[in-house]
Amino acid sequence: MRLSMIRILLAEDDAAMRQYLERALERAGYAVTGVDRGTAALPLLETERFDLLLTDIVMPEMDGIELAQRAGAIAPDMRVMFITGFAAVTLKAGKAVPQAKVLSKPFHLRDLVLEVDRLFDIGSASGLN
């Protein structure tokens, strides 16, 4: 199955939200590795290959924007998607990592899966704007 080869690194400090997102993405056929902070993601990025970094922006120790910038230096071909509940940080993220997608909370899990599918041109989302 094509989807099983797509690996997502999920950085989300809220444990319930992280588990919720992991389950939804795994049900959609993605391989997901979850971490609770940006500083926990960096060692994984150095030793494993991921296709997508899905990260909250507001996290302790290292925010998602800094994580995405550091990740870009380690794995320049990896795609980035931010998830955030703060409108002001959405603007900051867009300027700091312009090629990244930003999904604002609250969002429906179906919307998250569709956005991830769209990044990889999978399924019915293929070719849609």
What annotation goes with each model-predicted range?
Residues 12:
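Conserved acidic carboxylate
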Residues 19-27:
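Charged docking surfaces used in two-component/phosphorelay signaling
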Residues 29-36, 44:
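Short hydrophobic/Thr-rich beta-strand motif most characteristic of the beta2 strand and flanking loop
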Residues 36-40, 63-67:
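Acidic catalytic/metal-coordinating carboxylates
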Residues 59:
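Receiver (REC) domain active-site loop signature in two-component systems and cognate sites
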